[in-house]
């Protein structure tokens, strides 16, 4: 099973990883961090080269932390992916390009302003062609209620998780 773990460094994104770790020991987890500059007002001009460099540094710090968390949870570490730009577009493009089985993310990120502009996780749920796991808070329960639309994809993910 291939999982795309999406993180902006927020505690909630790492809660998603912790919540599902018990169920995905055999999965390979690729981690994507997208620094989304689309929230900047159009009136603000930036030096794109320096801003891209800063974005890359922030993404590297977040990805380093994510790698440690994945290792500490005893999970199989995959690739690191970093992008600057639209989080929604980057996540959807990556999930389709690499044919992941599951997108894993927190319900909302670090930026409170994004709640006003629209939720990345909500758009991923609505637009993704694969299964998604969205977490709100850490939960150490060993019971999970899976909902499915009956598609082969949904059933295969459940099969992978319970095997």
Predicted region positions:
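General small-molecule cofactor/ligand-binding pocket signal
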Residues: 30-32, 78-83, 133
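Short, conserved glycine- and acidic-residue-centered signature motifs
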Residues: 13, 59, 117-121, 154
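Structural beta-alpha unit
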Residues: 53, 68-103
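Short glycine/proline-enriched coil/turn segments at helix->beta-strand junctions
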Residues: 1, 23-28, 74-76, 98-99, ...
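A short acidic, glycine-rich active-site loop
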Residues: 49-61
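Small/aliphatic-rich secondary-structure junction motif
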Residues: 1-49, 143-163
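Gly/Ser-rich helix-loop-strand patches that form or flank binding pockets
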Residues: 92-140
């Amino acid at each position: 099973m291939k999982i795309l773990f999406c993180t902006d460094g927020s505690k909630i994104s790492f809660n998603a990883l912790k919540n599902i770790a018990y169920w995905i020991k055999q999965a390979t987890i690729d981690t994507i961090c997208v620094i989304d500059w689309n929230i900047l007002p159009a009136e603000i001009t930036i030096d794109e080269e320096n801003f891209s460099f800063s974005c890359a540094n922030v993404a590297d710090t977040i990805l380093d932390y994510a790698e440690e968390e994945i290792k500490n949870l005893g999970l199989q570490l995959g690739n690191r992916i970093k992008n600057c730009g639209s989080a929604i577009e980057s996540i959807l493009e990556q999930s389709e390009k690499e044919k992941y089985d599951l997108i894993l993310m927190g319900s909302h990120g670090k930026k409170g302003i994004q709640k006003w502009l629209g939720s990345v996780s909500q758009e991923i749920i609505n637009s993704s062609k694969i299964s998604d796991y969205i977490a709100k808070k850490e939960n150490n329960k060993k019971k999970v209620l899976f909902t499915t639309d009956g598609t082969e994809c949904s059933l295969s993910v459940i099969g992978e998780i319970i095997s």
